[in-house]
């Protein structure tokens, strides 16, 4: 009888594991294929060969790229080369990506940039916030951008127990930001278990020199984050839940959920079109291809435009889609004056004139 009970319990456990694996495949959209939506006047950006996970563009047309991200278990085309920050002047006729110099004293060898955000202070000082994973740890670096020298002056490294697995960031002050944690744990194995068990322990944290606090939680895997043009709302992408959350920002910097937009793709980073307030989303149509890399069946790319996200039925349009033959694993799309930049997790980056 004891053996029969043991076999029964083992069978239940295997059934539970099987159900969880099936659920994970569904969260990864493992069977989805994408139909191409091409754009004219596009070319790959020279000098970006191993990913440009995030892009942020200043009002004057200077675009910043975080390049060379490496994550445990994720493919890399340049595994031994440290990451960096590139800049492109979109006001120029034929813009090129140039790497910014970083001030002495900053550890360039372990630089592993992820999400980025800019903040312009009242005196026109430009700060660049960078999520960094040196040796796969979690920090936020604050730089001052020195335009005349094409350089970044490192000001501060931020570490905190409430920032265990930082993914993206939106700056709201010279030393103030909201950040997403895509996992509750920092250990790679515990992260895997957290994802496999679908625990929904990811969150959003507000950081200031005076206060650090969790302001939203219950996400499957909180990823991209941005702010509305009127600064009233925070947008958060939940990549494995295929959702964009709209959260209302309060004077004490707390957030309350206003609505959730469900999509049929894995939503990564979010950018705002400054001319319209529309949200541009870099997406992964098939997450399994992203994490299990096959050069003969590479991950595809998809960019969505979301108009009027606050209304009952926002308009969602596919701006660009590719099966991986041109661009693999799109993670971000940013626009400036009818010029579109599309970055990827670990592949190339695309420049298009709309």
From Swiss-Prot:
Glycosylated. Its main location: membrane. Glycans are attached at residues 254, 269, 323. Its cofactor is Ca(2+). Disulfide bonds join 42-352. Its EC number is 3.1.1.2, 3.1.1.81. GO terms for molecular function: acyl-L-homoserine-lactone lactonohydrolase activity; arylesterase activity; metal ion binding. Binds 2 calcium ions per subunit. It catalyses: a phenyl acetate + H2O = a phenol + acetate + H(+); an N-acyl-L-homoserine lactone + H2O = an N-acyl-L-homoserine + H(+). It comes from the Eukaryota. Ca(2+) 1 binds at residues 53, 167, 223, 268-269. Keywords: Calcium, Disulfide bond, Glycoprotein, Hydrolase, Membrane, Metal-binding, Signal. It is found in: Membrane. Pfam families: Arylesterase. Homotrimer. Capable of hydrolyzing lactones and a number of aromatic carboxylic acid esters. Belongs to the paraoxonase family. This is Serum paraoxonase/arylesterase 2.
């Amino acid at each position: 009888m004891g053996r029969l009970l043991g076999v029964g319990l083992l069978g239940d456990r295997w059934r539970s594991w099987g159900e969880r694996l099936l659920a994970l495949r569904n969260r990864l959209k493992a069977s989805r294929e994408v139909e191409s939506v091409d754009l004219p006047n596009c070319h790959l950006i020279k000098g970006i060969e191993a990913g440009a996970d995030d892009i942020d563009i200043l009002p004057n047309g200077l675009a910043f790229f975080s390049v060379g991200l490496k994550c445990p278990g994720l493919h890399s085309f340049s595994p031994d080369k440290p990451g960096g920050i590139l800049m492109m002047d979109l006001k120029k006729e034929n813009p090129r990506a140039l790497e910014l110099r970083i001030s002495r004293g900053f550890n360039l060898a372990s630089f592993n940039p992820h999400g980025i955000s800019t903040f312009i202070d009242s005196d026109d000082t430009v700060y660049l916030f960078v999520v960094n994973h040196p040796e796969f740890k979690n920090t936020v670096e604050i730089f001052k951008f020195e335009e005349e020298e094409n350089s970044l002056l490192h000001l501060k490294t931020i570490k905190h127990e409430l920032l265990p697995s930082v993914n993206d960031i939106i700056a709201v002050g010279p030393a103030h930001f909201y950040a997403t944690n895509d996992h509750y744990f920092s250990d790679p194995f515990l992260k895997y278990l957290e994802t496999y068990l679908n625990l929904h322990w990811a969150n959003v944290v507000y950081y200031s020199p005076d206060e650090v606090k969790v302001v939203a939680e219950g996400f499957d895997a909180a990823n991209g984050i941005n702010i509305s043009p009127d600064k009233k709302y925070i947008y958060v992408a939940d990549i494995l839940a295929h959702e964009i959350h709209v959260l209302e920002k309060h004077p004490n910097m707390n957030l309350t959920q206003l609505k959730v937009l469900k999509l049929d793709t894995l939503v990564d980073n979010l950018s705002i079109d400054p001319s319209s307030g529309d949200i541009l989303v870099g997406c992964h149509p098939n997450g399994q291809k992203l994490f299990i890399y096959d050069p003969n069946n590479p991950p595809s790319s998809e960019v969505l435009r979301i108009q009027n996200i606050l209304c009952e039925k926002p308009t969602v349009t596919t701006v660009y889609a590719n099966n991986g033959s041109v661009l693999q694993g799109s993670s971000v799309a940013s626009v400036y004056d009818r010029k579109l930049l599309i970055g990827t997790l670990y592949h190339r980056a695309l420049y298009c004139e709309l």
